[in-house]
UniProtKB/Swiss-Prot annotation:
Coiled coil: none annotated. This is Ribosomal RNA small subunit methyltransferase G. The gene is rsmG. It is found in: Cytoplasm. Belongs to the methyltransferase superfamily. RNA methyltransferase RsmG family.
Length: 178
């Protein structure tokens, strides 16, 4: 694993001891989550900007930002302690390419247009698409990290999905919404 990803994992485990940001207690529990965050880089189109919704403890945004330092990432996280953790990461890791915004998706009013919108374990795909599509440029994609519940979601229809173990990567172009 990339040394910067190891640093991220170490810091997350340290913060978990007092702040309970994720369920992981050991590196062996975090490594698969980091691998999961990076897996889509094998199949998604290149992108120059990304909006991550509900960034939480930084998955998938922080591993992606560390692997793609040339890409601009905006991390939306409404909860104070998680936003504080993300800001701390930005101060101690080479993450000049991220901006942390302490807001809910529904409150965010920036007119930006990004190439990719990501989310992991936040909400139903239809809801995420409806509330976030205004931030996605016309050639952009949604990338949602989903479990088996995706099969029950309406947004799943006519969507390119990639499956690895129990993870379903929902990958849908904005232009398919028309």
């Amino acid at each position: 694993m990339n040394p910067l990803l190891q640093d991220y994992a170490r810091i997350l485990l340290e913060w978990n001891q007092t702040h309970n940001l994720s369920g992981a207690k050991h590196l062996s529990e975090l490594e698969p989550q980091i691998t999961d965050a990076l897996k889509p880089l094998e199949f998604i189109k290149d992108f120059k900007s990304c909006l991550d919704i509900g960034s939480g403890a930084g998955l998938p945004a922080i591993p992606l930002a560390l692997e793609k330092p040339e890409v601009k990432f905006i991390l939306l996280e409404p909860r104070m302690k998680r936003a504080a953790f993300l800001n701390y990461l930005k101060s101690v890791l080479p993450l000049k390419n991220i901006e942390i915004v302490k807001k809910r998706l529904e409150e965010y009013q920036n007119p930006l247009q990004v190439d990719l919108i990501t989310s992991r374990a936040v909400a139903n795909s239809s809801f995420l698409i409806e509330k976030s599509q205004r931030f996605l440029n016309d050639k952009g994609y949604f990338l949602f990290y989903k479990g088996e519940q995706l099969k029950d979601e309406i947004a799943y229809k006519d969507t390119e999905c990639f499956i690895c173990k129990k993870r379903i990567y929902f990958y849908k172009p904005k232009e398919s919404l028309c």
